[in-house]
């Protein structure tokens, strides 16, 4: 599954004239490798190459991935950008994704001034947008579970309940249906809160 996804990204890179790309978005790296970690402020990148010699750049604080790619480890005290710069081809155009922080990109550009950097997020984003059969089945199952949980939540709500009570109930129902987690605390909004598209459930009580 992951190799097929990588192959689609490599094909898109080839259409852009790229032989290498640095993927830094954690969700995109998870999509391509199955390795799930959130790096916060630390460098984290998956280096894709046309020849298949891919590399995963990781801080030693991260768990060891089960991924069949060369792993390049570093610590907070290492010159990790020099390590990265020396591992890539500094003479060929480099694709980068749209979310890579300037604190990483600018030093890399200084290390390899002969390299042209190209915004190449579409190579990964377009692959992620085109769902395969497994993903479509997972989406259908997620939608089914969501329908079940929303029906339970509607039946559960009573006058006097707080937004947070209902939100916590919804989370518990997703867990009961086998979900690992929710992307965020469910949005439960009473009254004027309904005008806030990203409202965080609080202690406001439901009034009839």
Where are these regions (language model features)?
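A composition/biophysics-driven feature that prefers long, compositionally simple stretches
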Residues: 1-148
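Short alpha-helical functional segments enriched in proximate histidine and acidic residues
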Residues: 12, 156, 173-177
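Short catalytic-site patches enriched in acidic/histidine residues
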Residues: 29-39, 124, 161-208
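Short helix-to-loop capping/linker segments positioned immediately adjacent to catalytic or ligand/cofactor-binding
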Residues: 95, 153-161
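Active-site pocket-lining segments that scaffold enzyme catalytic pockets across diverse folds
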Residues: 144-153, 163
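Charged, amphipathic alpha-helical interaction segments
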Residues: 148-151, 158, 175
């Amino acid at each position: 599954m992951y190799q097929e996804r990588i192959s689609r990204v490599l094909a898109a890179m080839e259409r852009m004239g790229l032989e290498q790309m640095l993927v830094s978005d954690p969700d995109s790296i998870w999509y391509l490798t199955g390795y799930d970690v959130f790096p916060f402020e630390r460098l984290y990148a998956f280096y894709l190459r046309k020849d298949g010699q891919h590399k995963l750049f990781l801080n030693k604080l991260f768990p060891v991935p089960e991924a069949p790619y060369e792993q390049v480890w570093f610590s907070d005290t290492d010159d990790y950008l020099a390590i990265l710069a020396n591992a890539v081809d500094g003479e060929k155009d480099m694709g980068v994704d749209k979310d890579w922080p300037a604190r990483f990109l600018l030093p890399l550009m200084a290390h390899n001034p002969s390299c042209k950097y190209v915004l190449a997020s579409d190579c990964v984003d377009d692959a992620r947008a085109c769902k395969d059969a497994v993903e479509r089945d997972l989406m259908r199952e997620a939608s089914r579970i969501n329908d079940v949980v929303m029906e339970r939540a509607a039946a559960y709500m009573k006058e006097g309940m707080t937004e947070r009570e209902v939100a916590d109930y919804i989370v518990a129902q997703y867990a009961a249906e086998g979900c690992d987690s929710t992307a965020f605390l469910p949005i439960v909004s009473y009254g004027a809160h309904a005008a806030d598209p990203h409202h965080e459930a609080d202690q406001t009580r439901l009034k009839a």
